[in-house]
Amino acid sequence: MSKTPLTEAVAAADSQGRFLSSTELQVAFGRFRQAASGLAAAKALANNADSLVNGAANAVYSKFPYTTSTPGNNFASTPEGKAKCARDIGYYLRIVTYALVAGGTGPIDEYLLAGLDEINKTFDLAPSWYVEALKYIKANHGLSGDSRDEANSYIDYLINALS
C-alpha cells in the first residue's frame, strides 16, 4: 500500500490501538473535499478539452507567429504540424487531469517532466510554447471555486517546471 497522510494516520492509530482522533478525521474529510474538487475539475477539463486545446494552440500561434511560417516537422506551418501541436497540448492537458484525479504531482513528474528536456532538445521544441498554451488553458477553463484552485495549482506547477 502506498503511503499517504491518511494511510499513515490509520497505521499510527492502529499501532497505538486507538480510533482516529477528531483532528485526524478532519484531515481525512478535508482530503475527500479536495479530491471531489479535483475530480470535478478533471471532468470539466476533459469535457472541454477540444476547445481548450484549439484555443491554446491559437494562443501559441499568435504569440509565436514563426511557428506557423517556419517549415519543418516540428512547426505548425502545415496541417500535419498543427495537428502535432494540438496533440502535444492535449497531452499536457491530459496529464493535468491525471494529477487532479491522483491528487498530487506524481503524474506530471513521472509522465511528463521526466525526460522532457531531452525530448525538447531532440525535436527542437520550445518549452515557452507550452507555457503559453497552459496560460491560455488556465485563463479560459471556466472553472470556479475549489475546482478552479485545484486545477490552477497543477497548471501553475507545470508552468513553473517549464519556465
Swiss-Prot record:
<dbReference type="InterPro" id="IPR012128">
    <property type="entry name" value="Phycobilisome_asu/bsu"/>
</dbReference>
<comment type="function">
    <text>Light-harvesting photosynthetic bile pigment-protein from the phycobiliprotein complex (phycobilisome, PBS). Phycocyanin is the major phycobiliprotein in the PBS rod.</text>
</comment>
<dbReference type="Pfam" id="PF00502">
    <property type="entry name" value="Phycobilisome"/>
</dbReference>
<feature type="binding site" description="covalent">
    <location>
        <position position="85"/>
    </location>
    <ligand>
        <name>(2R,3E)-phycocyanobilin</name>
    </ligand>
</feature>
<keyword id="KW-0605">Phycobilisome</keyword>
<dbReference type="InterPro" id="IPR006246">
    <property type="entry name" value="Phycocyanin_a"/>
</dbReference>
<keyword id="KW-0249">Electron transport</keyword>
<keyword id="KW-0042">Antenna complex</keyword>
<comment type="similarity">
    <text>Belongs to the phycobiliprotein family.</text>
</comment>
<dbReference type="InterPro" id="IPR038719">
    <property type="entry name" value="Phycobilisome_asu/bsu_sf"/>
</dbReference>
<dbReference type="InterPro" id="IPR009050">
    <property type="entry name" value="Globin-like_sf"/>
</dbReference>
<keyword id="KW-0602">Photosynthesis</keyword>
<keyword id="KW-0157">Chromophore</keyword>
<keyword id="KW-0813">Transport</keyword>
<dbReference type="GO" id="GO:0030089">
    <property type="term" value="C:phycobilisome"/>
</dbReference>
<keyword id="KW-0793">Thylakoid</keyword>
<keyword id="KW-0089">Bile pigment</keyword>
<keyword id="KW-0472">Membrane</keyword>
<protein>
    <recommendedName>
        <fullName>C-phycocyanin alpha subunit</fullName>
    </recommendedName>
</protein>
<dbReference type="GO" id="GO:0031676">
    <property type="term" value="C:plasma membrane-derived thylakoid membrane"/>
</dbReference>
<dbReference type="GO" id="GO:0015979">
    <property type="term" value="P:photosynthesis"/>
</dbReference>
<comment type="subunit">
    <text>Heterodimer of an alpha and a beta subunit, which further assembles into trimers and the trimers into hexamers.</text>
</comment>
